[in-house]
A protein has these predicted regions:
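Cysteine-nucleophile active-site neighborhood
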Residues: 65-136
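Hydrophobic/aromatic beta-strand patches that form the interior of the parallel beta-sheet core
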Residues: 9, 39-41, 59, 99, ...
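Short, solvent-exposed loop/turn segments that connect beta-strands within catalytic domains
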Residues: 2-4, 91-94, 183-186
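N-terminal beta1-alpha1 cap of cysteine-dependent amidohydrolase-like domains
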Residues: 1-88, 211-214, 220, 225-276
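Short loop/helix-cap segments at secondary-structure boundaries that form the rim of catalytic
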Residues: 49-53, 109, 164-167
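Pocket-forming structural segment of enzyme catalytic cores
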Residues: 113-211
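Flexible, glycine-rich phosphate/dinucleotide-binding loops
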Residues: 17, 47, 67, 107, ...
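Short, well-ordered coil/turn elements that cap or connect secondary structure elements
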Residues: 3, 33-35, 93, 146, ...
Length: 276
């Protein structure tokens, strides 16, 4: 590892549970392996967090359980870590970039006081439409994606009831919402937030690929639960969505790569200016 290397910290929030998210994230990072190196930190099981000054880019994963609960140790240290990154960005020219996914996204929304987090009436799991907001139409995270686009959704909790005064105060923006459901009266959940120029988060799983989705369906209990919720026809439709190159493949190849390219370019550009 040289001084010129871009260092990425993956904050593993899965609490030791088997998952496909880590494999998918590492696969995407490896597409940039000529520029970056990474290390995994087991946040919830071992309370591992990186030193702020040692890494440049942070990806905080999805994970199981209630995002409003922790053990009073790892969760408080995690929130303090987020604050330390924010403080760093206020005081230093070379910025730290962070992506929050699913469980981490919900925790970040809570920490920043932007919205309510509550339990859904039923689990959301599958290939879902995601709609860009007006702000999302021009957000660089989504460059190359249509509107709406498709993503893998897997959540028991949701982010709703945005506190718009807090969004304005912090300069945060809602950049996508869940699918439009004309047949129900429930509020559309927030699917992504631009917390700042350097922090962004998604409720859905931008790392997911068809392999990860199929791996989840190998769990008989989960597969039967999805069929019970959606019916066999919609279940078959979801399987067809997996093979559509303009759906999950497109999202996997776009969002995290965009995040990494933006972060890497910003860091290298600033380093070059400072070295002159």
């Amino acid at each position: 590892m040289t001084d010129a290397t871009i260092r990425i910290a993956i904050l593993d929030m899965y609490n030791g549970e088997p998952n496909q998210g880590m494999r998918c994230i590492i696969d995407i990072i490896n597409r940039f392996n000529h520029l970056v190196e990474f290390k995994v930190f087991d946040v919830r099981r071992h309370c591992e967090l990186p030193e702020v000054n040692k890494y440049d880019i942070y990806i905080s994963t999805g994970g199981p359980g209630n995002p409003l609960e922790g053990d009073g140790n790892w969760d408080l240290k995690y929130y303090a870590f987020i604050d330390a990154l924010s403080q760093w960005n206020q005081e230093n020219a070379v910025k730290k970039h962070m992506l929050f996914i699913c469980h981490s996204f919900q925790m970040a929304c809570k920490h920043f006081g932007l919205a309510e987090i509550n339990k859904r009436r039923q689990t959301s799991f599958g290939v879902m439409k995601v709609h860009k907001t007006e702000e999302g139409l021009t957000d660089p995270l989504y460059d190359g994606l249509p509107d709406p686009f498709y993503a893998v959704d897997s959540r028991d909790y949701q982010v709703v009831q945005p506190k718009l005064s807090m969004f304005r105060k912090k300069g945060a923006k809602i950049i996508s919402l869940e699918k439009i459901r004309d047949h129900v009266q429930y509020e559309r959940a927030i699917m992504a937030v631009r917390f700042s120029e350097y922090f962004v988060g998604t409720q859905f799983h931008p790392e997911a690929d068809p392999i990860s989705y199929i791996a989840n369906l190998k769990n008989k209990e989960r597969r039967e639960k999805i069929i019970e919720m959606k019916g066999k026809i919609k279940f078959r439709d979801m399987l067809e969505d997996l093979l559509d190159e303009d759906k999950i493949y497109k999202t996997n190849e776009t969002i995290i790569p965009n995040f990494l390219r933006i972060a890497i370019n910003d860091i290298l550009k600033t380093r070059k200016i400072l070295s002159n």
